[in-house]
C-alpha cells in the first residue's frame, strides 16, 4: 500500500498508508507524481505546534474560538505536485492520459484528484517554477492589494518563496527601486538575481531610515511584509511614504509588546492592509478573485516570465529518509527557501 508524508502530531513527521479508489468519479483524474514542493511558512506553523494556539476559526461568527483547533492531525505534508495523468474520469474533457499536470496535494507517489484547481503544463515547463504557483499567487494578491503602479518604489520584507516571487512580480509591474530585505545572505543574493535593485541586511541598522534615504527621503510607495516580525512591521511604518500602503501577509504567532503606532504611522497616515488570496471576496471583487489570481500566475509561468530555479532548493528524494529530512530542512532557513521532492519516476 502506498504511503504519504504526514505530521502525526506537533513536532512529529511520519508516514501514513493510504488507498486510492479503483474506479474514478466522472470529474476525477488519476495522477502519478514526478515532483513536488512544500509550503514552508504555513506548514511550519502546524508542524512546530503553534498554528492551533488561537483555537478554531468560526466561519459563522468570523473569529477564532478558544479551545478548538484550526487543523486536526494527522496533517498531510506537501503543497504542490507535478505529475502525469494516468486515467481520466468519464466527464473530464480537458485532460488526456500522459498529460503533465500541476495540482495542490500532499507528498505521495500517486493521487486521485478532482479536475478543479489543476493546471496543464508543457513538457518544457520547469517543475520548480511550476510548483511555485502557490507562493506566486499569494505574492500577486499582495502586489495588487498594495496598489503598486509603474515607477513606484517598493520595499519587500522577508525573502521566502512569497517575498522572492513578489520581487519578480514587482519587476514585471515596472516598479523602481525594488528594495528587498532579509537577514539571510543567500536569499538576498537570489533577490538580486531575480529583480531587486537593492538589498538590505536588517540586523544592526535602521531599515526604515535606509529605505527613506534610498528614495530621496520620500519613502517607498508601498511595503510588502511577509516576515510577521514586529521589528519588520515597525520598519515598514517608518519607511513608507505619506499616505502609502503597508501590506501585511504573514501568518505569525502572537507578537510581543512594543509596536509603536504613534510615531511615523500617526504623522504619515499610511494604509495598513492585510492580504490573503484565499479570503474571497478580494478587494477588487467581483473582477478579481482567487481563481483569476491563480490563472494569471499560471499564464506567467507558461510564458516564462517567472523563475524559481534558485528558490526550490534543496531537492530531496521521496524515500523513507524524507520524514527525518523534512524537519531538518524546515528548521534551517539559512540553507533552504522552499524544498522540493523528486519521485522515483521523475523523467518529465
Descriptions of predicted regions:
Residues 237, 284-348:
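C-terminal hydrophobic helical "lid"/dimerization subdomain
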Residues 71-104:
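A glycine-/small-residue-rich N-terminal strand-loop-strand element
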Residues 100, 126-204, 209:
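Mid-domain Rossmann-like dinucleotide-binding core that forms the NAD(H)/NADP(H) cofactor-binding site
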Residues 148, 194-273:
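Glycine-rich cofactor phosphate-binding loops and adjacent beta1-alpha1 units
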Residues 76, 104-116:
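A structural motif shared across PLP-dependent enzymes of the aminotransferase-like
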Residues 18-81:
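N-terminal glycine-rich beta->alpha transition that marks the start or flank
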Residues 245, 259-308:
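Rossmann-fold dehydrogenase core element
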Amino acid at each position: 500500500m502506498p504511503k504519504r508524508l504526514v505530521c502525526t502530531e506537533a513536532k512529529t513527521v511520519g508516514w501514513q498508508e493510504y488507498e486510492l479508489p479503483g474506479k474514478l468519479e466522472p470529474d476525477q483524474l488519476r495522477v502519478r507524481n514526478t515532483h513536488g514542493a512544500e509550503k514552508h511558512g504555513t506548514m511550519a506553523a502546524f508542524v512546530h505546534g503553534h498554528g492551533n494556539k488561537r483555537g478554531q476559526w468560526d466561519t459563522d461568527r468570523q473569529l477564532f474560538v478558544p479551545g478548538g483547533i484550526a487543523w486536526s492531525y494527522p496533517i498531510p505534508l506537501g503543497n504542490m505536485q507535478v505529475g502525469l495523468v494516468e486515467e481520466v474520469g468519464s466527464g473530464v474533457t480537458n485532460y488526456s492520459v500522459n498529460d503533465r499536470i500541476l495540482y495542490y496535494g500532499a507528498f505521495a507517489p500517486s493521487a486521485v484528484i478532482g479536475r478543479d484547481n489543476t493546471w496543464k503544463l508543457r513538457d518544457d515547463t520547469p517543475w520548480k517554477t511550476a510548483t511555485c504557483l502557490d507562493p506566486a499567487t499569494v505574492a500577486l494578491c499582495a502586489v495588487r492589494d498594495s496598489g503598486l503602479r509603474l515607477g513606484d518604489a517598493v520595499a519587500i520584507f522577508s525573502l521566502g518563496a512569497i517575498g522572492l516571487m513578489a520581487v519578480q512580480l514587482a519587476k514585471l509591474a515596472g516598479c523602481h527601486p525594488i528594495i528587498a530585505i532579509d537577514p539571510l545572505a543567500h536569499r538576498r543574493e537570489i533577490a538580486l538575481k531575480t529583480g531587486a535593485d537593492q538589498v538590505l541586511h536588517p540586523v544592526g541598522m535602521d531599515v526604515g531610515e535606509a529605505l527613506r534615504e534610498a528614495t530621496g527621503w520620500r519613502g517607498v510607495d508601498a511595503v510588502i511584509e511577509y516576515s510577521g516580525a514586529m521589528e519588520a512591521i515597525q520598519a515598514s511604518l517608518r519607511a513608507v511614504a505619506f499616505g502609502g500602503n503597508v501590506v501585511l501577509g504573514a501568518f505569525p504567532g502572537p507578537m510581543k509588546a512594543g509596536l509603536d503606532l504613534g510615531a511615523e504611522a500617526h504623522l504619515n497616515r499610511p494604509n495598513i492592509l492585510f492580504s490573503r488570496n484565499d479570503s474571497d471576496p478580494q478587494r477588487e471583487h467581483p473582477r478579481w478573485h482567487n481563481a483569476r489570481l491563480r490563472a494569471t500566475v499560471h499564464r506567467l509561468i507558461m510564458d516564462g516570465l517567472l523563475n524559481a530555479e534558485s528558490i526550490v532548493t534543496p531537492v530531496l528524494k521521496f524515500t523513507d529518509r524524507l520524514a527525518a529530512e523534512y524537519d531538518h530542512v524546515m528548521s534551517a532557513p539559512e540553507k533552504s527557501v522552499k524544498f522540493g521532492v523528486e519521485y522515483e519516476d521523475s523523467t518529465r
